[in-house]
Regions:
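Short acidic-glycine-tyrosine-enriched beta hairpin
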Residues: 44, 70, 80, 104, ...
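A short beta-loop-beta micro-motif enriched in histidine and acidic residues
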Residues: 68-71, 84-96
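Extracytoplasmic
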Residues: 70-75, 142
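Short, conserved beta-strand element in jelly-roll/cupin
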Residues: 77-81, 92-106
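Short histidine-centered beta-strand/loop micro-motifs
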Residues: 86-91, 108, 115-116, 134-136
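Structural recognition of the beta-strand scaffold that forms the well-ordered cores
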Residues: 96-99, 106, 122-125, 144-148
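Ligand-binding loop in jelly-roll beta-barrel domains
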Residues: 113, 118, 127-155
Length: 168
């Protein structure tokens, strides 16, 4: 009879342990994560890439540029078909984007800000903390020339997860 009174307690303890393990396992599962959005409808051509081998400081006409060591400078021609997009991305360093033809819309994850740029206008992408997507929202082709300042050997673009609060 002594064994019979402990059996329900053992069963209850086993159920409690299994329930706790199940809850812990469910909590350990990765939450739904935003996935990277690959580029589409774009073609990029590397025009040139080179290394500034030494540190330098330049201050001219309100422009200040300072490097602590070598950096790469890359220039890329990007063509956006109608609806073409870079996908959400960042750059390891700043990028100066000049719209050559057409119109390009910049969507920034921070604050879900959007701004359009026409041919002849230039905008700055700020580097690794500036998650953004650029897209041709017109019916014609848009072309850009982009100059990147990068750590030596770094890629010009790195895919980033789509921000949940900025649906496109």
């Amino acid at each position: 009879m002594h064994q019979l009174t402990h059996r329900p307690l053992r069963l209850a303890a086993t159920v409690a342990v299994l329930a706790a393990a199940l809850i812990a396992a469910l909590l350990a599962l990765p939450r739904e994560q935003a996935t990277a959005t690959p580029p589409s409808g774009t073609a990029a051509e590397l025009l040139a890439r080179g290394t500034i081998a030494q540190a330098g400081h330049v201050r001219v006409a309100g422009i200040k540029l300072a490097t602590r060591g070598p950096i790469d400078v890359a220039t890329v021609h990007v063509t956006f078909q109608p609806g073409g997009s870079t996908g959400w991305h960042v750059h390891p360093g700043p990028a100066l984007v000049t719209v050559k033809t057409g119109r390009l819309t910049l969507h920034r994850a921070k604050g879900c800000r959007t701004r359009a740029f026409n041919a002849g206008q230039t905008f700055l992408e700020l580097g690794p903390d500036d998650v953004n997507l650029t897209r041709n929202e017109t019916g014609g082709v848009t072309e850009t020339a982009v100059t990147f300042l990068l750590p030596v050997g770094a890629p010009v673009t790195v895919d980033a997860p789509a921000p949940r609060r900025c649906p496109l």
